[in-house]
Every structure is written in structure tokens, then in C-alpha cells.
Amino acid sequence: MSSTWSPTVRRRMFCLLLAGGLTLGVAACGSGSGESTGGKVKITVTGQPPTSQPFERGVFDADVKEFEESHPDIDIEPHEGFMDPKTFSAKLAGGQLEDVYYVYFTDPAQIIARRQAADITEAAKGLKNFGDIKPELLDNFRDADGKLYGLPTMNYSMGLVYSRPLFQKAGLDPNKPPQTWDEVRAAAKKIAALGNGTVGYADYSKNNQGGWHLTAWLYSMGSEVARKDGDKWVAAFDNDKAKAALNQLRAMRWEDDTMGSKQLLEAQDVQRMMGAGQLGMYMAAPDNVPVLVKQFNGKYEDYGVAGMPGGQGTLLGGEGYMINPKASPEKIKAGLEWVRWKYLNPERFEKHVQQYVDGKQPVGLPAEPTPDVWQGAVRDQQLAIKAKHANVPAENYQSYVDSSSRIKGSIEPPNAQQVYAILDSVMQAVLTDRNANIDQQLSSAVSKVNSVLAQVK
């Protein structure tokens, strides 16, 4: 990986920069390359990893070749840049938007409202294994009438990443991670008591990452950040649950002194602490674990991932693909078949996992190459293949896997990045000012968030 951030955090930065770029109407969307070449349907697709990620690029290019061999009537023209905010808006404005394009889970609602994606409701019905995809993920790509505009290919939910060695040193059972925030607080006390600068629990509080994590905290307590009130969105976090979350954070920071003195942290700061063996726990998705190993000299066996403490909810995110609204029926059909074959294909589970094993990449995490987008028998099939080929201690993440089916996941609020910027200030106040007035912080944030939500169309 070329970045010290996990894919989850890199997607956050992409969305932050993209937030102002999805404001163009359907007239700005082109149809990509020509309709056909030599009798073939030619489609342009995003998702090709950059050359700085040689393993991922190699897998993608090999998949394109295999797909074209098995689908001689379809010609794939792959494009890099699916995470490049510098080109996304320009492509929309210049009519160069690909036929099949990547989106983050926060994007579909606005894209659909602005008619920047094709209606694939009927075309998707014939896709193999369509009924095995988790319906709550598909719902993220539907409009108010239930019409479908995209397919999910990867998802994550926030949980708790923790240091198994520090748990053991502190007399805690690493196979029984905290399930409530009170248990997190108690564990943080024992870990911080180890001394030598050891921090029990850390959290983000700048560059919108603080607001992102505060949203996850609120979900875990059973609160919302925004709710629909008739035809408009309104803030929904000036409540006792939000106050309880912030009071818990304040208590850990100031009463317990388990969060360290250095604050205004972001992802790479916290990952560096965990990789150095100086941090007990932090909130994150499972894709953080490979980053800790590859970029911060960690070991897979040293980390566990638990479900979101509190169990009343968690932040759900992910990615998927949508189709250019000007694409012909032939291109829509070809594009959906590419997405299904490449990303949503149980028949290729074993081969895809083997690609990772052969490339000495981690297998066993609840993340790529086995994204948790399936339900029922197909999910069981995927879990069995993952267990068969696991080259990392999958049992360390079992708590997270077990909780994923019972903890409700909620996607991010509308205009998420603007909301997060406001909530950053709340996190910063609580973590840097012992006397911060939580009621005032929430009241002020609600007023500002309502102004942001009023812009949602």
C-alpha cells in the first residue's frame, strides 16, 4: 500500500475533497467511449488500482483479461483514478464520465437525485446471486420509489481494534474484548496503568475524522445524527444519548487520564501509536489491521477486532458501482455483468482468495478479499473459504464477525463531510478543555448542522 491510511480512511479523504464536486446535472455526464468495436460492446470502467499498488493492479488487470476471454462480446477499457478527487468533477463537466464508475456509500443519494446514474432496476433482476446480496446494502442505491441505481461491492462497519499483548499485560482476556463502553473505560484504566506512556484508548478529532468517529459513537449509543422530518433533514443528536457519549469521552480523558495528553489526533497518529505497542484500543474498521502491519511494523497476531461497543448501532460504509445515465441498454447490461463477475461472484470466491494467498496478502480479516456483502448460504460459503485459506489469525476477529449480523449499521448523514467538520469542534472541545460545556457544544453544533442539512435537496 502506498498510503499510511487504511482504505476506509482514504475513502474519507476522497469524500472530503469530492463533497463539493457532485453538483452537476445529467447534462454533464457523457457516455464514455464508442458504443461498439468490431461487434463488441465497449465499456469504460473505473476501479483499476494505480501502479503504486502492484499487487492490486496485477489482480485487476488479470481479471480484465479473464473476463474478456469469457465474455468475447464485451471489451473493457479500465481507467485509474477511482479515488482521485481532482478528476471526478472534471469528468462530469467534460462528458468523460466512465460507463461504470465507483462511488462511496455517501454518494448515491445525491447522484440519484441529480439524475447522474442509470436506472438499473429491471436490468439487475436477471443478475445471478442478486438475491443473495444484503438488502440493506442494496437499499443504499435505491430512490424513494425503490428503483435501483447501483450495486454494492464492499462494505465496512466500525468496531474496536485492540492490542492483544497489552490486554494480556494488563490482566485482561484478549479473547473477551469489551462489549460496552463501560467495559472499554475499565479496560483503558488497566492498560494505562501499565505506565511508560501507554495509552488506554485514543480517538480522532481533526480533519473531519473526529466528526466521523463521533457519529459512530452516537450510533453505538442508539442516537441518530440526522433524521428525515417530512421532506427535509434535521439534526437529531441534541439528546441524552449524545450527552452520555461525550461525558464518557470526557471522563476517560480527564478523570481517568487514559487517553494520553496529546490530542487533535488523526488516523495515522493513532495507527502509529498502536503499531508501536503504546495504545490499547481505538475505534476503526478491520481494514486498519493490514495498515498496522505493513506501515507501522505490527504483527497480525498482536491485534484483535471486536464489534462496536454498546451494540445499539454502528457506522456503516462501503463502496459500489453505478452506471452512466447516458449508457445504452447494451452498455448497461455489459457494465452490470462486469460488476457482477468481478465483485459479486460466488463462483470466483476460491480463486479470488487464492490470488491473495499467492500474493502473500492477508486472508482471514472481515475485509477484502472476502467483503461482507452477502447473506444466507452464500455468506456461509464465503466464510468457509476464508477459514480454509486464512493466513492471519481469523479467530482474533471473530467477535467482530459475530456482531456484524446483530448490530444495526447506519450510513453516514447527508452532507456528511460538512456535518463532520462541525462535529470535529465538539470532539476537540471535550478532549482539550476539561471544563467544556457539553450541552452548549451540542446545542451550537445542532444549529450549524441544521443549516448544512437545509442544503440537502
What are these regions (language model features)?
Residues L292-G298, G311-L315, M322-A421:
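C-terminal lobe and pocket-closing loops
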Residues P108-Q110, H213-Y219, N247-W341:
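Extracytoplasmic/periplasmic substrate-binding proteins
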Residues T121-K134, P177-Q179, G200-S205, S223-A244, ...:
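Short, solvent-exposed loop/beta-turn-alpha elements that line the ligand-binding surface or hinge
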Residues S2-T8, R12-Q110, K128, P174, ...:
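Conserved N-terminal structural module of periplasmic/extracytoplasmic solute-binding proteins
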Residues A187-K189, D231-Q263:
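Glycine-centered hinge/linker elements that transmit conformational signals in sensory
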Residues F105-M158, H213, W217-S220, D302-G304:
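Hinge/lid segment of periplasmic solute-binding proteins
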Residues E80-F88, Q179-A186, S261-G275:
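Short helix-initiation/N-cap motifs at beta->coil->alpha
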Residues A144-T153, M158, Q168, D182-V234, ...:
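Extracytoplasmic/periplasmic solute-binding protein
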